[in-house]
């Protein structure tokens, strides 16, 4: 991995994708021997590195240095800085076509027609051109049909990289004309190696691993995000540390004005409960229990699956209440009651 400057976000390099196993081996082989295809479909849940892999593939295809991608030649730098003239990036809400309004949630047909027109022109530098379509599932059906025509008659030297979290929303005929690159959650050991490579101390690395959902980028991001951990400390203190019903009103009142953090709070509670469950069943390091008050530590050591499922259901119910326009303070109070009920069983 590399960091371009002090305090900059860490950047993955192509070799970091060795953690994806056979996907990496096959991709490197085709890139190195020139047998790459004209279209790839890169799919994964959010945060697994689709955009990063697309950038690295573009660097490899356009690199003018040795050891592709070298990362230091003008082409590699331009790709990294998103200003290479032969890399076309389609992003929902940020149209290239003057006929498309900015801020649109989807990718309309006029945007794809505009891209098709660009693809038909000579490259600026000479050689290859790369077209990256982010959130490809956001193309409406006319847009997908317009892209399909181009994929059926590919221009020599042009490589399409379609990025999506929902490949099932793409036309089967588009999917069939792309080589699938399906990214999976990164193995724990790969994420820990990445954190160590960036000098993240051991305790923080374990915490970042427990909340990153298999995403290297997310792990590196939260490890350096003090505001994130401050909110989690607040959640731990207020939601897991509360010991008496008389404190519920006090806590709910304190969180009433933090409604903009509601999604994050519920995710934090869910993550903390999941960590307890994973520790209990040997899937996470037991040292993670040290952050929890003693009754919750006991749950993490001795709890049974029904207890964890009941707590997870309480978070699901809180989300349902929010969707039904229940006041945020009432949602917080109901969640606190559910947590206190379970905590009381482990306070003996």
Can you say where each PLM-predicted feature lies in the sequence?
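Clamp-loader machinery-focused feature within the broader ASCE/P-loop NTPase space
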Residues: 2-142, 296
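Hydrophobic residues in beta-strands of the RecA-like P-loop NTPase core, especially within AAA+ ATPase
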Residues: 42, 133, 147-148, 164
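Conserved strand-to-helix beginnings and helix N-cap segments that scaffold or border functional pockets
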Residues: 141-145, 263
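Conserved adenine-binding aromatic site and its adjacent loop/helix in ATP-hydrolyzing domains
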Residues: 117, 149, 172, 176
């Amino acid at each position: 991995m590399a960091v371009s400057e002090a305090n900059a976000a860490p950047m993955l390099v192509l070799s970091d994708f060795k953690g994806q196993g056979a996907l990496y081996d096959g991709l490197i082989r085709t890139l190195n021997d020139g047998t790459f295809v004209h279209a790839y479909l890169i799919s994964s849940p959010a945060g697994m590195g689709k955009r990063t892999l697309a950038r690295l593939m573009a660097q490899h295809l356009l690199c003018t240095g040795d050891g592709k991608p070298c990362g230091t030649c003008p082409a590699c730098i331009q790709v990294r800085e998103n200003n290479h003239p032969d890399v076309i990036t389609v992003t929902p809400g940020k149209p290239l076509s003057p006929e498309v309004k900015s801020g649109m949630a989807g990718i309309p047909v006029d945007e794809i027609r505009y891209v098709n027109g660009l693809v038909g022109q000579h490259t600026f530098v000479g050689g290859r051109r790369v077209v990256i379509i982010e959130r490809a599932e956001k193309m409406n059906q006319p847009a997908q049909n317009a892209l399909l025509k181009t994929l059926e008659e590919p221009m020599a030297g042009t490589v399409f990289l379609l990025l999506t979290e929902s490949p099932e929303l793409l036309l089967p005929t588009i999917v069939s004309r792309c080589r699938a690159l399906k990214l999976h959650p990164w193995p724990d050991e790969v994420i820990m190696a990445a954190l160590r490579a960036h000098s993240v101390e051991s305790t923080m690395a374990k915490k970042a691993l427990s909340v990153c959902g298999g995403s290297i980028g997310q792990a590196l991001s939260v490890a350096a995000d003090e505001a994130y951990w401050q909110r989690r400390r607040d959640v731990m203190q207020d939601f897991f540390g509360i010991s008496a019903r008389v404190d519920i009103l006090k806590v709910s009142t304190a969180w009433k004005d933090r409604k903009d953090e509601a999604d994050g709070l519920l995710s934090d509670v869910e993550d903390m409960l999941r960590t307890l469950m994973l520790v209990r069943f040997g899937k996470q390091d037991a040292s993670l229990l040290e952050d929890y008050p003693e009754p919750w530590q006991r749950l993490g050591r001795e709890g049974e699956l029904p207890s964890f499922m009941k707590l997870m259901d309480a978070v699901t119910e809180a989300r349902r209440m929010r969707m039904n326009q229940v006041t945020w303070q009432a949602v917080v109070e109901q969640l606190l009651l559910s947590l206190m009920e379970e905590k009381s069983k482990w306070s003996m």
